[in-house]
Structure formats: structure tokens, C-alpha cells
Amino acid sequence: YKDTRSGFTIIEVVLVLAIAGLIFLMVFIALPQLQRAQRDTQRRNDIIKLQSAIETFKGNNNGRLPAGKCDVPDSDDPKLGDFTASKDRDNSACRLIKEYMHDNNDASINTFTDPGGQTYDIVIEKYNDAFNAPNQMDHIMHVLTGATCDGELPMKSNNSRDFVIVYRLEGSGVYCHGNNG
């Protein structure tokens, strides 16, 4: 006796469902890692943008590096409230943000925010051996003058005009980027 009905057997259906389940599982495991890597890439690009702003600042200020700390208080509007609260500060770290890191159409808007929309704080200080790399995501970009990068960590440079930017990434440790390569 031969059955001529067309259709799938239960084994074929279960096999297709199992394969589909594996594909969905791989997507759900890989997607957060891809998103985290994408956010870290944006942070690296932000660090390069900050380096460029510092180089421009140096060029406009007789080779002097900016100094100080520009931490902005929390606000409901991370792009406007934080920057407005800090834009009138006189230290050169805040001037760096105000004059070199603003929106081209509106100088009162701080566009220097991380991929999550949180405003970056900037701490600019002379490197010393006691510096500890950030161990958590605190949205602080550490600019260390008189330093160069040794992998992920800064180290003392013989040139006082060298600087590095150190930031804790979300997925892959600490990122150290220097102006000397």
C-alpha cells in the first residue's frame, strides 16, 4: 500500500523548527555583542574627534595644551542642559568643549556625547605614575599630558606636549589613544 498524500512528516517539521530555533539563538547571542562593538567604535571615533579638537586648541594657543576638569552636572537634556551649565566656566577644558566640540549650527549645544546620549566629562591633567586606568564606564575621558600609550595604558613621555586620551570601553577594556601615534 502506497500513500500518495503530500505533506511533511513530523520529523521534517521538528528538524526545520530546531534549525530555525538555532538561528534565532545565534542572532540573540551575537546581536548584543555587535551593538556593543558598534558603540565602542563610535567611542573610539569620539576620542579621535577630541584629539583633533585638542590639536586645534594647541594651534590656536601657542602650543599650550588645555588643562583642568570639565564635568557637567546631570540634566534632563544631556545635549543642552549639561553644556549650558558649564559653557561659561573659564578653565580651558570647558573652553575646549565650548569652542571646539559644539554643534556647528548652535554653539550652545554640546554634541560631545557618547552613543547612549550621555555627555562626556573631560579631565585634563599631567601624567603621573599613580594614574589608574578607569575600571568602569563613567563617561570620563582622561586626557593625560606628558604621556604616550603603551598598549592600553599610558606611560610617561619625554615630550611635555605629548598627550593621550584614556577611556574605558564597554566591551574591550581600556582604549588609549595618543597624539604621537
What residues fall within each predicted segment?
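Intrinsic disorder/low-complexity segments enriched in polar/small residues
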Residues: 1-3, 119, 137, 163
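N-terminal single-pass transmembrane signal-anchor helix
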Residues: 4-35, 39
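A generic fold-level signal
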Residues: 5, 42, 157-160
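Alpha-helix exit/C-cap motif
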Residues: 32, 52-73, 102-106
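Membrane-proximal amphipathic alpha-helices
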Residues: 36-50
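Acidic, glycine-rich loop-and-strand cores that form catalytic or ligand-binding grooves
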Residues: 68-148
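Short, surface-exposed interaction loops/tails
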Residues: 142-181
